[in-house]
Amino acid sequence: MSVLNAETPWGALEIADAHVHFFSPAFFNALATQKPDAHDAEGVTKLLGWDNPTSPEALAYRWAGELDRHNVQRAMLIASIPNDTHSVGAAIEKYPSRFSAVYMANPLLPSPDMRLETAIREDRVNGIFLFPAMHHYSMHDPKVRALIQVLAGHPHSLVYVHCGVLSLGFRKKLGLPSPFDMRYSNPMDLHELASSFPRVNFVIPHFGAGYLREALMVADLCPNVYLDTSSSNGWTKYLTMQTSLEGVFRNVLNVLGPKRLLFGSDSSFFPQFD
């Protein structure tokens, strides 16, 4: 397949999207169990006004078309319920040159390290996405460390860690509670792990979602920590100094340089909005 290049003010560039949620049939089935009056996954998608994916393969086909439409060469897919490695694995099997993947891992579930080894070997995932505030655990928990130790044994592995404000619009739209705990949201909690496992790459999405200063401090100290640009960046309203989003980019680039700031769209559902 020929390489896709997007026309930009800086010329033709190869674009990769580091943050795409893969809302699979399993994702909507899981929501349906929390929303009994929706009856099933199709009922959930109707309430949300989204298209209902018929299979992981069909969803992968649609995402590949979306990448083509926007001249994006590759995307990092995120399996957005715990352990949904089969869905993203099916996407990678169908389009190995277009997709890589991480999956939501909850270290408090049984045998998370064994699940991760299996996911890397069988579903070809590249790593995990941790949501400490969602699942109520500390990044200092030994079970988290066990997962990072697994990743350290695999070249080019990575872990996304959601820090800062966590607000899921689809849960609000469905009237579902979001009992998150922001005590576990500080990027500073990554410092010891990132320092101890220099071969594992850590990604803090959304510029730290309100913890920009802390995210920059950790990334400045640890060369294996990256930030991504995903989301609407509504967290900027929490900045104590009036800074535009352009100013945020300049600040991050001044500290990290361009190679450790990843473009992410935070795309998730169909139909997409241009």
Regions found by a protein language model. Give the residues of each.
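Mid-domain alpha/beta scaffold segments of enzyme catalytic cores
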Residues: 1-146, 150, 213, 230
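Residue-level preference for alpha-helix termini and adjacent loops
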Residues: 14, 98, 224-225, 268
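Generic intrinsically disordered, low-complexity segments enriched for polar/acidic and small residues
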Residues: 16-20, 96, 246, 260, ...
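Active-site environment of divalent metal-dependent phosphoester hydrolases
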Residues: 23-25, 82-84, 108-111, 165-169, ...
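Alpha-helix capping and helix-coil boundary motifs
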Residues: 55-59, 111-112, 240-244, 257, ...
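Catalytic pocket-lining loop regions of alpha/beta-barrel enzymes
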Residues: 126-127, 140-262
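His/Asp/Glu-enriched, well-ordered alpha-helical/loop segment
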Residues: 258-274
